[in-house]
Amino acid sequence: MKVLKSWLNDWIDIQDIDSNDISEALESLGFEIESRTDKVPNYKNIVVGKVLEIYTHPNADKVRVTKVDVGSKVYEIVCGAWNFDIDAVVPVALPNSEIKDGFKIDKRDIRGIESNGMICSASELDLWDDHAGILKLSKNTKIGSDFSKIYNSVDTLWEIGVTPNRGDCMSHLGVARELSSYFDKPIKSNDIKLSPNIENVIKVNSGRTKFCDSYLSVEIENFDITDSDIKIRYRLSSVGVRVINNVVDYTNYVLHDIGQPLHAFDRDKLFGTISVRKAKENETLKTLDEQTRKLSKDDLIITDNDSPIALAGVMGGYNTEVTDSTKNLLIESAYFDKVSIMKTSRKLNLISDASIRFERGIDYDIQHKGLERFISVFKHDQNINYSEAMISKKNTFSHENITFEKEDIFNILGVELKDDFILKTLSKLQIQSTLADNKISFTSPSWRYDLERPIDLIEELAKHYGYNNFNSTLPIGKNLNNKGEFWNKRNYISNLLSSKNFYEVQTLSFTDKEANSIFTPEKNSVTVINPIDQTQESLRTNLLTSLINTYKHNYENNTLSCKYYEINNVYDDGNHKLYKDIPNQEYSLGLLIPENETNPDTRGEYIQNDIHTLTNIINLLFPKVQFEKLLRPGFHKNYSYVLKLNN
């Protein structure tokens, strides 16, 4: 993710803090800095001008001659761009100035007409890559003013890595919250006062589905599709977003500003009540990319009078898109279930800035602020008529109060943190907390899904205390020469199976809940907190699924049919034998023998295996084992057994 210093300064006063110190702070707070760019453009003698006259060049048909008022004087300038007219407000490079790459601008003769400077494009000023024509500024911009004052020309851009559990940091506000604690500077309130002046035409509701907690909308009437404000275009371009027009740019701006995805509909193409539901099997929707998508019952959609008009949180529909002729808008701001959005975006290969933020978890209480922010930015651009927000909310979210002993901090960190530091740090992070009787109680804010256990808060305190402030200590442990009975048995099993041409595999412990229930329905799965892959939300209760998947993958990729074994942990939600409060885990041995095995010596004819091949191997491993018939759904009634050893 890319963040801009001047943009961060909207939320926290850091303009006077050296960019090197901010880089150090970001790394200390756990953000990997992937790149840094210091923007120091030279805008000497570049001012704001107004085009007074335009006429044809007497000796050239591909350029025009203009007269431009720069406040103190009117200059005659020859220009090759055709995207502006009389009264356009533009940046002007006067004689004795420099533009991008140190290119010098002076008076020059162009086919018999003296050109006193240059009217500039965004690309020529190194703002963003736009070669479509001259950069047009707001009509309200003061003529003759220094162009460098139009926006913060000296700036720093960081590209940082954000871990999957910190979806709240996928915005400038989120990063500013972290820096707020580090630099002990408050977050700016940026309160917005709005005065709606029209009534809502379209009704909205969040539907009966549990996958949409809130759905809000606001309507705008009789506006103009134009270029967005220069500051917005500069900021979006800097963070890698393509600028299009004011509507699209302002929705993208809110996304990168506070982390709330928005979507714009052409209100004149809507006819009834906007709602949210799961799609019907094989229902279709034509999306903005003009592709007709066949949907499944797992896809969450937005409907108008129950007809699909958008893929919730992923992509809008073609039939309700905003075009250059759009005059009335409906802006959507919603909270959609992150797992549902992830499944749809991955299945359809439609991954966007919005879907990524929904997947990682957005603030469930910021939807109204997203609409306010959009209206505020739009109002700055032009006079608009807008409604108050239409709100449909289920209020299904709440964060539990978590309590733990203060001594747990010392036991884990080895550092005695003072009460004042603990409370002050949590307050700056807007985490509600109390400290009494050596117990800390806290409730995480609506944007922090990663604070679910005491260890999460302790990690947060360690981060803001500063890992560089911890004293180095040598680890204390015992050096045992003997490997122990378990490892002796493990080595014996591994050596024996390897001698019988088995390949050992090591697979991840994550799986989906349904895979567990196939082979071990009697065991309850352990749910993974905040899984990186939402389809791998459980810990395995058996090794059979992973062995089958390994065989399938290897056979499909190299056509080898091999024998495999795995010795690894399996888990269930029972009580651990030694440790309380953690799930039960046990080592398990899994074997897989194909009916037709690739000959490891010749890679030629297959070796034929059957149930006796497997029982012979088991008897070698465990000579006193007993086989009892297993009757269970999903298992072959003649070839399934329970193995018993010493009863």
Show the residue positions of the predicted features:
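Phosphate-backbone binding interfaces of nucleic-acid-interacting proteins
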Residues: 1-193, 330, 347-348, 353, ...
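Conserved mixed alpha/beta core segments that line enzyme active sites in large multi-domain catalysts
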Residues: 34, 48-77, 238, 251-319
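Short, glycine-/Ser/Thr-/acidic-enriched flexible segments
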Residues: 52-59, 73, 82-84, 95-99, ...
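Terminal amphipathic helices with adjacent charged low-complexity linkers/tails
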Residues: 179-207, 382-409, 416
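Conserved phosphate/anionic-ligand binding catalytic regions in large, soluble enzymes, centered on
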Residues: 2-7, 81-89, 164-183, 240-264, ...
